[in-house]
Design a protein with these regions (language model features):
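Transmembrane-helix signature of polytopic, membrane-embedded enzymes
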Residues: 103-111, 128-150
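Start-transfer (signal-anchor) and selected internal transmembrane alpha helices
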Residues: 1-50, 133
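Short hydrophobic/aromatic helix or loop-helix immediately within or flanking a transmembrane segment
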Residues: 61-105
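Transmembrane-helix motifs of polytopic, lipid-linked glycan transferases
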Residues: 94, 112-135
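Short acidic/glycine- and proline-prone juxtamembrane loop motifs at membrane-interface regions
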Residues: 158-165
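Transmembrane alpha-helical segments
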Residues: 124-132, 169-180, 203-204
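Hydrophobic residues within the alpha-helical transmembrane core of Major Facilitator Superfamily
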Residues: 18, 115, 146-150, 157, ...
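Membrane-interface alpha helices of multi-pass inner-membrane proteins
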Residues: 149, 153, 171-175, 183-206
Length: 206
């Protein structure tokens, strides 16, 4: 991949990430938060140590609903949340140690999940470029990358959900299948099934 292409993807990703923060900051200032549903805010599941910090930052939109489950699994293991596949929270747990996680639901788990999700999506964009470049022109591929980045629901890839990791593994499996490297295609396909249930559908495609 040429340096100019990498710079294009990196700059597009940074702009996308910045734009996603704008409505969060605006909403935090202008809209009233109404707590009550147990999976809508990380502050509701916090210990007292970091709760004041979490309350001052617009964090909860990036880790609510499924995100809370993944962080809980990473910090406490499985309880009654067996519907969430293990690869994503398994990655969060060791990375959180880098941020100094020491207690259950420490904010380090949030930042670890956030870093993994966004890093996986950035890597997915690079693999997406490589995969599409097999069949399409540079202009078509870059247009496709922008379409993926600025699709209305692309914010899921920036949240602490497994979508970004799933996309990365799907693209890696597909790319190596196109290159007829069946060992790596199968390896990433296997990891795909550890991320979401529908990952098993990759094998008939391969």
């Amino acid at each position: 991949m040429q340096r100019k292409t990498f710079a294009f993807i990196a700059l597009s990703f940074i702009i996308w990430r910045f734009l996603l923060f704008i409505p969060v900051f605006v909403a935090e200032k202008k809209l009233d938060y109404r707590p009550g549903y147990e999976y809508t805010s990380i502050t509701d599941a916090r210990n007292s140590k970091d709760k004041s910090i979490a309350d001052k930052l617009p964090l909860f939109p990036w880790a609510n609903f499924d995100g809370l489950h993944y962080i809980t699994i990473a910090s406490n293991g499985y309880t009654n949340n067996y519907g969430f596949f293990p690869l994503f929270p398994t990655l969060i747990s060791p990375v959180s140690k880098i941020f100094g996680a020491s207690e259950n639901f420490d904010l380090a788990y949030f930042f670890s999940g956030f870093l993994i999700s966004n890093s996986a999506f950035f890597l997915a964009l690079l693999v997406f470029y490589k995969l599409l470049s097999i069949d399409y022109s540079d202009k078509q591929v870059k247009t496709s990358i922008l379409a993926l980045l600025f699709f209305p629901t692309s914010f899921f890839f920036g949240s602490i959900y497994s979508e970004s990791l799933f996309l990365l593994l799907l693209l890696l499996s597909s790319y190596f299948a196109r290159k007829k490297n069946w060992l790596l295609a199968s390896f990433f396909g296997a990891l795909l099934t550890l991320t979401r249930f529908v990952g098993i559908c990759i094998f008939p495609v391969l």
